[in-house]
Amino acid sequence: MDTFGLKIIASDRVFYEGRCRKLVIPAPDGEKGILPNHENMVIAVKIGMARMEIEEGNWVEVALGRGFAEVVNNRVTLLVDTAEKPE
């Protein structure tokens, strides 16, 4: 399956930078799913849990603060207040 570039930037560090197969992020109007070759867009991100599939069947959860996601040219950049691994 195709992948896309994903970069998660918190206010204090780059949390993740690499390839991703699927991404689900919390948005004010519900969860948004992003797949490879998604159309370009900007999405508001609300506080909540994001899920990303790095390898087939290997899902990773990330606790996100407020921010936004930019989807452009098969790359997704998440700019958020905080990004943490859930405990």
Predicted segment positions?
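Intrinsically disordered, compositionally biased charged tails
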Residues: 1-3
